[in-house]
């Protein structure tokens, strides 16, 4: 997961010492049974208390959760008293693959908070944090300021979003990126000495080279 390996410990730093616990899965996807095992592993005071499940759509390995997979995780999280966060840096690529409405793989599937990225689809900088449960957004503006996430010219970071979303450019760009990745994958599979490591379901291809 990106929050574990590629953020220099920032999530745990800004969460005042919160501990990230890792659950296993195949091809970058969290396994519901593994989530439950981590959540129920221990209940004593010496062990971190699970509070939220974070999943990435599309995943760090280029795979995509189907809507029913996210619904299963969402339902499990509710039973365990956990919230659900989605890292959507490549959400548009996942939507282009699935051909569904955004709601089907976010709030209707049990996602509470979405980090919606657009830099993979043409925007220079910035992400949108979407709270489907508004209670979780309490004083979020203050936390953004403390974390250095309030740009002095925030309007310039925000301006491209309506154009990208209303005009359909985000999905068009995502489809194009997925198509290019599929073309690359096909070329790689034609070379016997190269091996594609994971199913290519979005715009990422992972290859083992000699």
Regions found by a protein language model. Give the residues of each.
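Conserved PLP-enzyme active-site core in the AAT-like
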Residues: 1-210
């Amino acid at each position: 997961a990106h929050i574990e390996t590629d953020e220099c410990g920032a999530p745990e730093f800004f969460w005042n010492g919160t501990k990230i616990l890792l659950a296993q899965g195949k091809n970058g996807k969290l396994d519901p049974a593994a989530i439950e095992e981590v959540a129920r592993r221990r209940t004593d005071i010496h062990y971190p208390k699970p509070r939220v499940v974070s999943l990435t759509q599309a995943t760090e390995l280029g795979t995509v959760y189907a809507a029913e997979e996210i619904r299963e995780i969402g339902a499990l999280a509710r039973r365990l008293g956990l919230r659900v966060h989605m890292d959507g840096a490549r959400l548009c690529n996942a939507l282009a693959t699935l051909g569904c409405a955004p709601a089907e793989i976010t709030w209707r599937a049990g996602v509470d908070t979405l980090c919606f990225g657009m830099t993979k689809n043409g925007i220079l900088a910035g992400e949108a944090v979407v709270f489907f449960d508004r209670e979780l957004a309490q004083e979020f503006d203050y936390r953004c300021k403390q974390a250095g996430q309030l740009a002095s010219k925030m309007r310039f970071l925000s301006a491209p979003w309506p154009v990208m979303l209303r005009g359909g450019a985000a999905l068009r760009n995502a489809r194009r990126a997925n198509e290019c990745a599929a073309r690359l994958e096909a070329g790689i599979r034609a070379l016997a000495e190269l091996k594609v490591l994971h199913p290519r379901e979005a715009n990422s291809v992972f290859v083992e080279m000699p």
